[in-house]
Amino acid sequence: MHNQAPIQRRKSTRIYVGNVPIGDGAPIAVQSMTNTRTTDVEATVNQIKALERVGADIVRVSVPTMDAAEAFKLIKQQVNVPLVADIHFDYRIALKVAEYGVDCLRINPGNIGNEERIRMVVDCARDKNIPIRIGVNAGSLEKDLQEKYGEPTPQALLESAMRHVDHLDRLNFDQFKVSVKASDVFLAVESYRLLAKQIDQPLHLGITEAGGARSGAVKSAIGLGLLLSEGIGDTLRVSLAADPVEEIKVGFDILKSLRIRARGINFIACPTCSRQEFDVIGTVNALEQRLEDIITPMDVSIIGCVVNGPGEALVSTLGVTGGNKKSGLYEDGVRKDRLDNDDMIAQLESRIRAKASQLDEARRIDVLQVEK
């Protein structure tokens, strides 16, 4: 119902992480990272599957040891979502997980050894068609750059990133994406802006170590929102000191808010006041939990009175406008029914599920007609 945002995406090259296209206009991929011990195969698999259920396109797994690499082999066999192996210092781990079917390597070429070891990893990645993510972080800048700049700056992060890019360029390897993360919003944003002007490769966005569920979501929404609104970014991760599942939910909420990528229900709800005719807050909270399984994109407005309710309902897939004892239900901008305020949650859940099924069937028919 609402128009898509007129955001002009930055042009970038195309790579694939497993079967997920990255860059060159592909949908912005949302990813997270496991926080289990990788050697605990069962716990890690369970967490990855939980991330899959809420829509994760890609999942990163830390592989710090050879034991973790052996566990990675077993994990990879039990999940469907593409996996990125996060590797530092030991090039042999990168070679090992490449044998085990890793979909992407997250490394910094500068910290896995000498030129020959870098070449071995890159040659292996090329032979097995595995992309690489260069991950620069303000908290782990090279010592000489810390001394040169005195502190992490956008120019320092850019210089670090370009060093790693140059490593891959010298080896004639172009299947990579880059990130320049920082916990400071403005440092991260300016670093990405500078990098976006220097290279054509896809960019992975993130505000690193953003904080807990609430503060981290706010920082990420501001930082990623600024970049995405400028067309910068091909994949993203919302880094939270919280359940990784929340990272995926917040990531999609950011994309939905910018009308870049829709997944599931976009709830539009008033903050409530004394004019509300039913429990708006309780209704929204209950429906968000009950309807997490719905992936059909739709706007649902839940407004407690007639001041703004009708206007929001006009541009929503489904909309409720609070009234005395009964509230008006709108579908595609047209008033269709009245719902009992005392049974609002159950009635609205039923209507939303029915509408989702209707929209899914309509899209299925459209696809079949196109294929004919």
From Swiss-Prot:
Entry keyword annotation includes 4Fe-4S: yes
InterPro entries per the UniProt record, alphabetical: Dihydropteroate_synth-like_sf (IPR011005), IspG_bac (IPR016425), IspG_bac-typ (IPR004588), NO2/SO3_Rdtase_4Fe4S_sf (IPR045854)
Cofactor note: Binds 1 [4Fe-4S] cluster.
Top EC class of this enzyme: oxidoreductase
Top-level lineage group: Bacteria
Positions that bind [4Fe-4S] cluster: C270, C273, C305, E312
Listed EC numbers: 1.17.7.3
Protein source organism: Salmonella typhimurium (strain LT2 / SGSC1412 / ATCC 700720)
Free-text function comment from the UniProt entry: Converts 2C-methyl-D-erythritol 2,4-cyclodiphosphate (ME-2,4cPP) into 1-hydroxy-2-methyl-2-(E)-butenyl 4-diphosphate.
Molecular function, one GO term: 4-hydroxy-3-methylbut-2-en-1-yl diphosphate synthase activity (ferredoxin)
GO biological process: isopentenyl diphosphate biosynthetic process, methylerythritol 4-phosphate pathway; terpenoid biosynthetic process
Pathway noted in the entry: Isoprenoid biosynthesis; isopentenyl diphosphate biosynthesis via DXP pathway; isopentenyl diphosphate from 1-deoxy-D-xylulose 5-phosphate: step 5/6
Family per record: Belongs to the IspG family.
A UniProt-annotated Pfam family: GcpE
This protein's UniProt keywords: 4Fe-4S, Iron, Iron-sulfur, Isoprene biosynthesis, Metal-binding, Oxidoreductase
Reactions accelerated catalytically: (2E)-4-hydroxy-3-methylbut-2-enyl diphosphate + oxidized [flavodoxin] + H2O + 2 H(+) = 2-C-methyl-D-erythritol 2,4-cyclic diphosphate + reduced [flavodoxin]
PANTHER family in UniProt: 4-HYDROXY-3-METHYLBUT-2-EN-1-YL DIPHOSPHATE SYNTHASE, 4-HYDROXY-3-METHYLBUT-2-EN-1-YL DIPHOSPHATE SYNTHASE (FERREDOXIN), CHLOROPLASTIC
Official protein name in the record: 4-hydroxy-3-methylbut-2-en-1-yl diphosphate synthase (flavodoxin)
